[in-house]
């Protein structure tokens, strides 16, 4: 993501459910600011449930000429936000879990990984092994259109409507200094820069697998319980299971197929299809009821 941000010439569109205020999160915000400072249009869409400690930094970024921040389905109370749940639970319980990072309309990263130390092996005690994909080609246009749908939805609020814009950027400067002061930051950054993936991106030698891809995404109106019938991912996945001819592979941290989903997958297996499901063990999950 940093390599793509540094190479951006026209635009960066980023949206995430969780963006943590830690070394990884602050470092990537710094890269987005640097891109905006050199004239790149930056749009950042975050879910309000996953950014509880970033109001000051996001408010500062939102004042920059080329930087715009919007918040999806914001809480009624800024602090503590959890108090909003009993006041407006039906709405507040509908969150935006979409994650994408699109640069110049030519490359995008999509998948399950949020932004934070625990998602990038930066935390020494906890690691979330989420899966994402770097993509180029026609699917980037689909991701861009989906981003625009969420960005322009009735549930996406300009950050300045929620938090009073700051008169200076001291909070942002302090956050950047905090990230740089971490003694392990330089070594971690170097190890990432030396990785085969980043070197392939920077050297334009990264080998891509060219395959047909279809993007499925919920209609953003689901946050208002107003999504038209047939516009949710769960609805779109059901017929795909029936159309499979050889195999079905599922990767999900929270695998809850329900009765209908279980029956569809079991039927496919009985018909001779190879069905593989990769999910958390009981020891690894962070949501025990799942």
Regions found by a protein language model. Give the residues of each.
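Charged, low-complexity intrinsically disordered terminal segments
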Residues: 1-99, 103-290
């Amino acid at each position: 993501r940093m390599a793509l941000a540094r190479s951006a010439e026209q635009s960066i569109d980023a949206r995430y459910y969780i963006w943590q205020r830690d070394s990884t999160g602050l470092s990537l915000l710094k890269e987005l600011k640097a891109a905006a400072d050199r004239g790149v249009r930056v749009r950042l869409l975050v879910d309000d449930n996953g950014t509880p400690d970033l109001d000051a930094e996001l408010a500062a970024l939102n004042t920059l000429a080329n930087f715009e921040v919007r918040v999806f389905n914001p809480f009624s109370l800024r602090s503590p936000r959890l108090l909003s749940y009993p006041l407006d639970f039906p709405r507040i319980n509908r969150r935006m879990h979409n994650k994408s990072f699109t640069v110049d309309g030519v490359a995008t990263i999509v998948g399950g990984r949020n932004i934070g130390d625990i998602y990038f092996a930066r935390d020494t005690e906890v690691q979330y092994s989420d899966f994402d994909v770097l993509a180029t080609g026609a699917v980037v246009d689909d991701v861009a259109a989906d981003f625009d749908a969420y960005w322009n939805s009735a549930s996406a609020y300009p950050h300045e409507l929620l938090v009073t814009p700051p008169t200076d950027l001291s909070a942002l400067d302090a956050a950047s200094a905090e990230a740089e002061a971490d003694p392990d930051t330089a070594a971690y950054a170097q190890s990432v820069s030396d990785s085969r993936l980043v070197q392939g991106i920077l050297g334009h030698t990264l080998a891509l697998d060219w395959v047909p891809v279809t993007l499925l995404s919920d209609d953003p109106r689901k946050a208002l319980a107003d999504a038209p019938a047939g516009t949710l991912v769960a609805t779109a996945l059901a017929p795909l299971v029936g159309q499979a001819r050889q195999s079905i592979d599922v990767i999900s941290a929270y695998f809850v197929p329900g009765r209908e989903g279980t029956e569809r997958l079991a039927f496919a297996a009985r018909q001779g299809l190879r069905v593989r499901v990769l999910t958390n063990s009981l020891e690894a999950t962070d949501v025990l009821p799942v």
